[in-house]
Each structure stands twice: as C-alpha cells, then as structure tokens.
Regions:
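Glycine-rich flavin
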Residues: 2-5, 22-28, 34-197, 230-234, ...
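FAD-site-proximal beta/loop scaffold in flavoenzymes
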Residues: 183-197, 292-321
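N-terminal Rossmann-like FAD-binding beta1-loop-alpha1 element of flavoenzymes
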Residues: 6-32, 210-218
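Rossmann-like NAD(P)H-binding beta-loop-alpha module
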Residues: 195-237
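Beta1/beta-strand and adjacent pyrophosphate-binding region of the FAD-binding site
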Residues: 2-13, 197-207
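Glycine-centered short loops/turns at secondary-structure junctions
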Residues: 27, 221-223, 253
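Short, well-ordered coil/turn residues at beta-beta hairpins
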Residues: 11, 167-169, 188, 204, ...
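Glycine-/small-residue-rich beta->alpha transition segments that form the dinucleotide
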Residues: 162-164, 168-174, 290-303
C-alpha cells in the first residue's frame, strides 16, 4: 500500500525545499525525500552557510591586522579552532533547525531515505508515478518526519505515489581528470573540515568557491596561490567584477597564476601537494607546492540513468525549457 502525494521532491537542498514550501503554500500534499541526516543540502550543511561562518572569523582577523591603519593598537594572539568549529556547527544547526521547523509547519512530510523511480516520459501528465524508498546507507529503517526533529521509523521499504516528481538531487565536487581527491588534494567539503588553516594552499579554479577559500585563507595568514585558466577570475561573469576581484586579490597578497592548465598533481600522506601546470605562451611544465591543494573547478550533477528520464552527455536531466 503506497501513500499518495500531489508532489514528491527528491532532494532537500535549496531547490528541493523551496519547491516544497511553495507547493505546500498552494495547497498541494508534498513529500520531501532526503538521504542525509539533515535538510538543507550542500548550501546549508557543507557550502554557503559554513563557509560564511569561517569567512566571518577570518574577516575579523583581517580587520585586527589592519587596525593600526586607523590608529588602533590590536593583535591576534591565536585561533582556538575548537571554538571556531563549534561556532560553525552552531550556525549550521540553527539554520537547519529553522528550515526543518518551517517544513513541518507547512505540513510537508520529510522522509530520510534513498529514492528510486522509473519515469515514463511518454505517459500522460496526469499519470501517477511510484517512488520506491529504502533506508539511507547508515540507517536500518526509513525515517518519516511529520514534526521537526521527531523521526518515526517506517520500515525497510516504502512506496510513494505522486502525480508529479521533482528531481532536486544537487551536485558533487568535480575532480581533476586523472587525479581523484586523495591525500592533500581536497574538495570544498573537506576544506571546511580542516583542523587548522594551512600555512600554504594551492587553489585550482576561479569561481565563487575558489575565491571564497582564497580570500578566507589569505586573511588568516596562509600563502595562497590561485591557478586560473583565463586572464581574470570569474571569467564567465561580468568583466568588471572579475577584473576588480583579480586586482583586489593580488593587492591583498594572493598569488594568481593566469592562463594555467593543470596537468597532474603529486600528493601523499604528509607530503602536501605539488601541482604541475603549463601556461599559455610559455614552454615547459611548471609546478607549485602547497600544504593542501583545493580543487574548485565546478560541480557534477547527481543523476542516475535508471530514473528513466533523458540524461545528456554532461549528466544533466534534459528538459524542454
């Protein structure tokens, strides 16, 4: 026996929960499925929010370092990384808790589970679809939340029926070709979990994530090298914004190597990371070493051909929009 919903949403990140809240506001019966322990997706748990918490801390450090320019005598005596970690987790917990409460208030049923389905793209728009649930990898039962923070074990399998399904499964960090994340070669999630700011860091990428960590670590006193493929950061964005940020990062001490293409990375336990690269217009291969190397070259969609929907060559769900 399956439970009927007007809308089933797979993924409780910003795309999923925003859709759920609006659909519930319009009177739909909504189910929101999330495999992780908390709602909010990458942004709230492993991205935008925790990174801003750390940026707040490093901005404070930078302000103190520049206080003498204003005639204020101040100094940074050290960083208590345990307290900083607690602050970051507290900020995340507060926002995730607020979101969970809002979802419950709107009458949205949240399932902690993995979802599987097979859509028929030729079926009429009014057809029902079956979404099969199984427990998340670290759980023995599916957990159902009718109230925030009150899980109800619901057995090892469950089927939901819905007229409409929204896929909002998000994305994962994209590794360098031929260089999987390992050793000191890390992704943005791992970068948020470091126990101390690195003495030196190489960042590969020129987008928002790369620039957040470049500015954060630089403000904390790290020696930061930024490897970018174009002549400025944010090359796909507004030219003035990219040019201004490139200039300001350099002014603050970030070493930006432009027109660089990474060939490979050497890393190992306690060895740091040596990033090898070539530069447009220059002969031979060059290298730069960092205690850690952060790869921030984009994200790949989390999709599955077994869903029965058309997946393009880049892993995206094909749409008619």
């Amino acid at each position: 026996m399956s439970e009927q919903f007007d809308l089933v949403i797979i993924g409780a990140g910003p795309g999923g929960y925003s859709t759920a809240l609006r659909a519930a506001e319009l009177g739909m019966k909504v189910a929101l499925i999330e495999r992780d322990a908390t709602v909010g997706g990458t942004c709230l748990n492993r991205g935008c929010i925790p990174s801003k918490a750390l940026i707040t801390a490093t901005h404070t450090i930078d302000t103190v370092h520049r206080a003498a320019e204003l005639g204020v005598n101040a100094s940074v005596n050290g960083i208590d990384f345990g307290t900083l970690r607690d602050y970051r987790l507290r900020v995340v917990k507060t926002m995730v808790g607020g979101l969970a409460g809002l979802l419950a208030h709107r009458g949205i049923t949240v399932f902690r589970a993995n979802a599987a389905f097979h859509a028929d793209e030729t079926a009429p728009a009014t057809s029902n679809h079956i979404v099969h649930l199984v427990p998340s990898p670290d759980q023995s039962d599916i957990l159902t939340y009718h109230k925030a923070d009150v899980p109800e074990p619901s057995g090892p399998t469950m089927d939901l029926t819905a007229t409409n399904i929204v896929i909002a499964t998000g994305a994962k960090p994209r590794p360098l070709p031929g260089n999987p994340f390992a050793g000191a070669l890390i992704d943005s999630t791992q970068a948020l979990e470091v126990n101390e700011f690195p003495s030196s860091a190489v960042i590969i990428g020129a987008g928002a994530i790369a620039l957040e960590f470049a500015s954060m670590w630089n403000a904390a006193g790290s020696k930061v090298t930024l490897l970018i493929r174009k002549d400025r950061v944010l090359s796909a964005w507004d030219r003035r914004a990219g040019t201004t940020l490139t200039r300001e990062l350099k002014r603050h001490g970030v070493n930006i190597i432009t027109r660089a293409s990474v060939t490979h990375v050497d890393t190992g336990a306690n060895l740091g990371a040596t990033v090898h690269y070539t530069r447009e217009g220059q002969d031979g291969e060059q290298s730069v070493w960092g205690e850690i190397a952060l790869v921030a070259i984009g994200r790949d969609p989390i999709t599955d051909p077994a869903w029965g929907v058309t997946i393009d060559d880049h892993g995206h769900v094909a749409t008619d929009a």
